[in-house]
């Protein structure tokens, strides 16, 4: 965080365009950029972007704790050659539903999920829809399990690998049991 303890800055942009972006600055502070159009009404979109701010802050906190500035904590790294990381969108969506659960089943993302539910957690096709694993994870291991997955990720793990290391002693059969209960 910046001197004085600021951890999040919110910018309301004077524009007629629709703007909603959550991230941060200089690996030190979370930031949210929104426009009036995204605030009327405030809802899961704003909560989703605030989720990205929290995700960004995970890396900032790792740096404060002495981690090297190499983008290898807090899932700051991407997967494979395209450097994509659907987990950021999946996690932000899950975080938004914590504040706006009534939108979870009415949101247009549900239709996409029903068409794509056979895909793996971090598949790019379901980057906004596949938040169900986080519900199962937190129901089984507590709400802190979500933040532990983020805080204790280790490059080049994906979320499943971090989960296996933290909760299942890297036992693949235990992972299969956990996934198919």
Show the residue positions of the predicted features.
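Active-site rim elements
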Residues: 79-82, 117-124, 135, 148-151
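Short helix/loop segments within enzyme catalytic domains
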Residues: 96-116, 141-155
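Stable alpha-helical elements in mature extracytoplasmic
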Residues: 42-50, 87-91, 95, 130-133, ...
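Beta/coil-rich, acidic/histidine-enriched accessory regions frequently appended to metallopeptidases
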Residues: 157-181
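Juxtacatalytic substrate-recognition/specificity segment
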Residues: 1-84, 92, 102-103, 119
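Soluble non-cytosolic domains of exported or imported proteins
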Residues: 37-45, 82-86, 124-128, 139-140, ...
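Catalytic-site signature segments of enzymes, centered on catalytic residues
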Residues: 108-131
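Amphipathic alpha-helical segments within well-ordered protein domains
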Residues: 134-135, 164
């Amino acid at each position: 965080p910046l001197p004085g303890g600021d951890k999040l800055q919110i910018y309301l942009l004077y524009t007629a365009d629709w703007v909603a972006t959550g991230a941060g600055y200089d690996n030190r502070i979370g930031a949210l950029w929104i426009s009036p159009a995204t605030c009327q009404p405030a809802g899961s979109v704003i909560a989703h972007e605030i989720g990205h701010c929290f995700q960004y802050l995970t890396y900032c906190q790792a740096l404060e704790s002495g981690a090297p500035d190499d983008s290898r904590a807090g899932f700051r790294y991407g997967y494979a050659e395209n450097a994509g990381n659907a987990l950021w969108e999946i996690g932000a969506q899950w975080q938004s539903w914590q504040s706006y659960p009534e939108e979870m089943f009415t949101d247009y993302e549900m239709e996409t999920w029903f068409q794509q539910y056979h895909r793996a957690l971090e598949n790019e096709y379901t980057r906004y829809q596949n938040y169900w694993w986080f519900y199962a994870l937190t129901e089984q291991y507590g709400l802190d399990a979500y933040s532990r997955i983020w805080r204790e990720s280790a490059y080049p793990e994906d979320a499943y690998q971090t989960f296996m290391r933290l909760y299942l002693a890297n036992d693949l059969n235990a992972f299969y049991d956990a996934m198919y209960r």
